[in-house]
C-alpha cells in the first residue's frame, strides 16, 4: 500500500530531524548524554520464525511469506489482498499467509530485539473460495506474547471472521523485555478457505533480532549410553490435593523423599520424571506445579555432603495428544519450557508419552520443537510410544508431516525413543521394539529403551494369575497390581540384550513404591536388574551393528503389525516376551524415511536392507528360512535364550500359563540343560573355572485381590477398587505385609563332567532361597543343580 509506505518514510524523516536537533543541543550546552537507540520497522516476512504450523490437510505445505497460503504453495506470485473498511481491495507486498487450524501458530523470537510495537492488517485473503457459509470462516485470531493473549478478534467479532469481514487493523504495544510473539488463528467448522493473512505485519524494534537457526547444540547436561544407563522414576501429581494448595503426588511420595530412597550407587544413573496426571485442566496449573518442583529440585542439599546437589528432573510435557480435556500439559508452551531449561540445571530433559490413542495435528510439530529446545540447552527429548495406529510411522512422516523427522536428522544425539507396551489392540509389542532398534542403529535415535507397563494386564483382560477367561477392563486397579514381578525383569532383559539403555516402569506405585518406600517389585527385581546393567554395560551401537545382518524397511501397519513376527520369534501378536533370541530384536525402519538415507547410514556395515514385503519375507515360512540362513542356531529347546559374549540369557516366555520350559546350551565347553518355571530369568556366565549363575523368579501371591471370584464372570462383578484403595493396598498389604510366594524350583544339568561341581559364593535376600543342591551321577558323568528360591540369587558353580 503506497499510503502506508509514505507514512513510514515520514516517521523515519522526523526521527532523523529530532536526532540532529538533539546533537546540536548537546554541542551547544556541553552536556554529556548517551546515544539513543533508533527504532525501526522490521517486516515479519523478512525474519525467520521459530516455528510455523497450519491447518491444511497436506502437511508438506508450508506457511507462506508475502503470499497467501494456497497460491504460494502452488508457486503462484499472487500478492496478499484484503477487503478494506471502505469496500476497496488492497494488495500488500509484505505479510504472512497460513490456514487456520486448532490453532495454527506462527512463533517469533523477539528476545533482546527491543520490540515496542506490532502492526498488521488481519483477515481472510481474497484468494479464498467461500463456496458455502462454512468455508472461509475463522473463529478468531490472537496475538500472544510470552503466553498471554494481548489481542483477540473475538472481542470485536464474537461470531468469528468471514470472507466479507473487512481487514482488521491492529497496532499493539508490546511489553518491555518480551521474548516470544505468536500469531494464532483458530479454524471454524471447516478449514477449507480459511486463508488467514497477516498483511503488512511488522515490528517496531530498537535492537537486532536473533536468528532462531543460528545456534549449535549445547554440551549435554548428562551422558546417557550403554555405560551410563538411565532409570526413570515417575511421580504423578495429585490434582485434588493441588486444588487445596498442596503440591503433592499420588501415593504420598515427596520429591526429596523419593530421591533419598534411591540407593546411592544408582543415583548417578537415575532421574525423577514428573507427570501432570489429574492436575486441574486449565492454563497455568501444570507450569505452576512443575516450577514449584523444579525449585525444590534445584535447591536440594545432600544431607550426607551438606552440598547443593540438584535432583535431576525430566518433565512430562506432552501426553494424550495434549488434548485439553485429558491433560494439564496442554497449556505448557515451548516458551515456558525454554525458560525452565534456562533457569534450572536440574532439568535434564522433557518427556512425551502415550499419544497413539489420540494422535492430534500438532504431535509431530511439537515433538520437533521439544527436540530442538533440548538440543539447544543440552537436554534430551525422550519419547515413549507404541506403534498402534502407525504412530511411529506417523512420527517420521507417513502422513506427510516431516517436521519431526527433519529435526531428528539434525539433532538425533538429543533424542531417545522408548516403547510403551501398554495396549492390546493391533499387537504391536514386537514391531515397536523393532522400530526402536532400527531407528537407533541408523542414527535416528541416540539411545533407545522401554516403558514396561503393568497396565497391560488390564488392557488384555487378565485377572488372577494363570486363570482363564477374559474380564475386559472391568477391574483396572486390581489388574495392574497382578502382573508377576519377575516378568518386568524379563521385559527389561529384552532391552538390555539389544543395546537399549533407558528403563521406565508403570504402574509407579506397584513398580517403585509409595510413601517414599520401595515396593517389593523394585527391591527384588528392578533394583537388582539395573545394578547388573550398570556393572555390565549392554552392547554398544557399534557392537550391535557388527552382529546385525539384516534390517527391515517398510511399515508394519501394511504388513500385519504384530502378526508379522508370530511363529518367527513371538508366540502371539501381543506379547511382552519373545520365544527365541536367535535373531536378536530384528530391527526395522519405516518407509517414510528415504531409503537412500538409510543405506547411507548403513554403509560400511554388513547389514542388508530388505523390504518387509519382499518375496523372501512374504510368509512365515519364507521369513524363517531367510533369518535362519543369517543367524545360526546356538541352542535347542522350547525356551527363550540369547547368547552375548560368554553369557547366556535365558527365560521362560509363558507369562500367564503355568508351563515349565527347557533348553540345552553349550557353556564352558560343557553341555548344559536348563529347566525354568514361568516368571524366571537366568544369566549363566562362563568364568573358565566356574559358571556364575544369576537367577530371579520373584513373585508374590496376590490372590487376595481376587477373593470371592472363582471364574472370570465372577471377577468382573467384584466391587471395583478405587485408586486410593489401590494405593493404600500397596502400602498396607504389599509393602508392609508382603505375601511372598512359595519358593519355586529351577534345575541346571551339566553333562560330561568328571566330578561333582561345588556351589560357592551364594548371595541373595535372607530367607528367599535354599542353598542350591548338587546331585552327581558318576555313571552318566552328569550333575543336577537344584535351586529353590523366590527372588534374586547369585552363586558360582565351580566345575574345575
From Swiss-Prot:
Main location group: secreted
Main enzyme class: hydrolase
Pfam family, one: Glyco_hydro_98C
GO biological processes: carbohydrate metabolic process
GO molecular function, one term: blood-group-substance endo-1,4-beta-galactosidase activity
Superkingdom of this protein's organism: Bacteria
Catalytic activity, EC: 3.2.1.102
Catalytic activity from the UniProt record: Endohydrolysis of (1->4)-beta-D-galactosidic linkages in blood group A and B substances
The keyword Magnesium appears for this protein: no
Residues of the signal peptide: 1-35
Keywords: Carbohydrate metabolism, Glycosidase, Hydrolase, Secreted, Signal
A cellular component term, taken from the record's GO annotations: extracellular region
Record has Transferase as a keyword: no
Subcellular location: Secreted
Function of the protein: Endo-beta-galactosidase capable of releasing both the blood group A trisaccharide (A-Tri; GalNAcalpha1-->3(Fucalpha1-->2)Gal) and B trisaccharide (B-Tri; Galalpha1-->3(Fucalpha1-->2)Gal) glycotopes from blood group A- and B-containing glycoconjugates, respectively.
Family (UniProt): Belongs to the glycosyl hydrolase 98 family.
Protein name per its UniProtKB record: Blood-group-substance endo-1,4-beta-galactosidase
Amino acid at each position: 500500500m503506497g499510503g502506508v509506505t509514505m507514512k513510514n518514510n515520514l516517521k523515519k524523516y522526523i526521527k532523523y530531524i529530532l536526532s540532529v536537533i538533539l546533537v546540536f543541543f548537546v554541542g551547544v550546552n556541553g552536556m554529556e548524554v548517551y546515544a539513543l537507540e533508533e527504532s525501526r520497522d522490521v517486516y515479519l516476512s523478512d525474519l525467520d520464525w521459530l516455528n510455523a504450523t497450519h491447518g491444511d490437510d497436506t502437511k508438506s505445505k508450508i506457511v507462506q511469506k508475502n503470499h497467501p497460503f494456497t497460491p504460494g504453495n502452488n508457486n503462484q506470485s499472487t500478492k496478499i489482498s484484503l477487503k478494506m473498511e471502505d469496500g476497496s481491495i488492497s494488495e500488500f507486498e509484505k505479510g504472512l499467509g497460513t490456514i487456520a487450524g486448532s490453532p495454527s501458530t506462527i512463533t517469533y523470537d523477539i528476545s533482546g530485539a527491543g520490540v515496542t510495537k506490532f502492526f498488521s492488517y488481519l483477515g481472510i485473503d481474497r484468494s479464498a473460495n467461500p463456496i458455502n457459509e462454512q468455508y472461509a470462516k475463522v473463529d478468531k485470531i490472537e496475538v500472544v506474547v510470552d503466553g498471554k493473549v494481548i489481542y483477540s478478534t473475538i472481542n470485536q467479532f464474537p461470531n468469528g471472521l468471514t470472507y466479507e469481514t473487512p481487514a482488521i487493523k491492529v497496532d499493539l504495544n508490546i511489553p518491555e523485555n518480551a521474548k516470544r510473539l505468536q500469531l494464532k488463528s483458530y479454524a471454524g467448522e471447516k478449514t477449507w478457505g480459511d486463508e488467514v493473512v497477516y498483511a503488512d505485519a511488522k515490528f517496531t524494534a530498537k535492537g537486532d533480532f536473533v536468528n532462531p537457526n543460528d545456534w549449535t547444540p549445547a554440551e549435554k547436561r548428562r551422558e546417557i549410553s550403554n555405560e551410563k544407563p538411565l532409570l526413570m522414576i515417575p511421580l504423578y501429581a495429585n490434582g485434588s490435593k493441588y486444588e487445596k494448595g498442596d503440591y503433592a503426588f499420588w501415593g504420598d511420595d515427596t520429591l526429596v523423599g523419593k530421591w533419598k530412597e534411591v540407593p546411592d550407587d544408582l543415583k548417578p544413573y537415575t532421574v525423577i520424571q514428573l507427570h501432570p496426571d489429574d492436575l486441574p485442566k486449565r492454563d497455568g496449573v501444570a507450569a505452576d506445579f512443575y516450577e514449584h518442583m523444579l525449585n525444590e529440585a534445584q535447591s536440594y542439599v545432600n544431607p550426607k555432603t551438606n552440598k547443593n546437589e540438584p535432583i535431576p528432573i525430566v518433565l512430562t510435557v506432552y501426553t494424550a495428544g495434549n488434548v485439553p480435556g485429558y491433560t494439564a500439559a496442554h497449556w505448557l508452551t515451548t516458551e515456558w519450557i525454554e525458560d525452565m531449561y534456562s533457569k534450572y540445571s536440574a532439568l535434564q530433559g522433557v518427556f512425551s508419552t502415550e499419544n497413539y490413542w489420540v494422535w492430534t495435528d500438532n504431535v509431530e510439530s511439537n515433538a520437533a520443537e521439544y527436540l530442538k529446545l533440548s538440543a539447544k540447552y543440552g537436554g534430551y527429548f525422550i519419547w515413549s510410544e507404541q506403534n498402534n495406529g502407525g504412530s511411529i510411522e506417523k512420527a517420521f512422516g507417513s502422513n506427510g508431516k516431516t517436521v519431526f523427522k527433519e529435526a531428528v536428522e539434525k539433532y538425533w544425539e538429543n533424542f531417545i525413543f522408548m516403547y510403551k507396551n501398554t495396549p492390546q489392540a493391533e499387537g504391536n509389542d514386537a514391531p515397536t521394539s523393532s522400530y526402536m532398534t532400527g531407528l537407533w542403529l541408523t542414527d535416528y535415535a541416540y539411545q533407545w529403551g522401554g516403558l514396561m507397563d503393568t497396565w497391560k494386564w488390564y488392557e488384555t483382560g487378565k485377572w488372577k494369575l494363570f486363570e482363564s477367561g477374559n474380564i475386559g477392563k472391568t477391574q483396572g486397579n486390581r489388574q495392574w497390581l497382578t502382573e508377576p514381578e519377575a516378568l518386568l525383569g524379563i521385559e527389561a532383559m529384552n532391552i538390555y540384550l539389544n543395546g537399549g539403555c533407558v528403563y521406565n516402569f508403570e504402574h509407579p506405585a506397584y513398580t517403585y513404591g509409595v510413601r517414599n518406600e520401595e515396593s517389593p517389585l523394585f527391591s527384588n527385581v528392578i533394583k537388582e536388574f539395573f545394578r547388573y546393567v550398570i556393572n555390565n554395560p549392554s552392547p554398544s551401537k557399534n557392537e550391535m551393528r557388527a552382529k546385525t545382518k539384516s534390517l527391515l524397511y517398510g511399515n508394519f501397519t501394511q504388513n500385519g503389525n504384530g502378526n508379522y513376527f508370530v511363529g518367527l520369534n513371538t508366540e502371539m501378536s501381543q506379547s511382552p516376551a519373545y520365544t527365541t533370541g536367535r535373531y536378536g530384536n530384528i530391527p526395522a525402519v519405516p518407509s517414510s524415511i528415504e531409503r537412500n538415507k538409510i543405506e547411507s547410514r548403513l554403509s560400511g556395515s554388513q547389514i542388508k536392507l530388505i523390504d518387509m514385503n519382499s518375496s523372501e519375507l512374504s510368509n512365515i515360512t519364507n521369513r524363517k528360512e531367510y533369518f535362519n540362513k543369517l543367524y545360526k542356531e546356538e541352542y535347542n529347546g522350547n525356551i527363550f535364550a540369547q547368547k552375548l559374549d560368554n553369557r547366556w540369557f535365558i527365560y521362560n516366555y509363558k507369562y500367564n500359563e503355568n508351563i515349565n520350559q527347557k533348553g540345552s546350551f553349550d557353556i564352558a565347553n560343557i553341555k548344559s540343560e536348563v529347566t525354568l518355571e514361568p516368571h524366571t530369568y537366568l544369566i549363566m556366565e562362563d568364568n573358565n573355572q566356574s559358571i556364575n549363575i544369576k537367577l530371579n523368579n520373584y513373585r508374590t501371591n496376590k490372590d487376595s485381590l481376587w477373593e470371592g471370584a472363582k471364574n472370570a464372570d465372577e471377577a468382573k462383578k467384584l466391587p471395583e477398587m478405587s485408586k486410593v484403595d489401590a494405593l493404600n493396598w500397596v502400602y498396607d498389604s504389599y509393602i508392609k505385609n508382603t505375601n511372598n510366594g512359595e519358593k519355586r524350583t529351577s534345575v541346571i544339568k551339566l553333562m560330561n563332567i568328571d566330578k561333582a561341581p561345588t556351589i560357592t559364593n551364594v548371595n541373595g535376600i535372607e530367607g528367599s532361597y535354599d542353598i542350591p543342591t548338587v546331585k552327581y551321577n558318576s555313571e552318566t558323568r552328569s550333575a543336577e543343580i537344584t535351586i529353590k528360591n523366590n527372588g534374586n540369587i547369585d552363586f558360582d558353580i565351580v566345575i574345575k
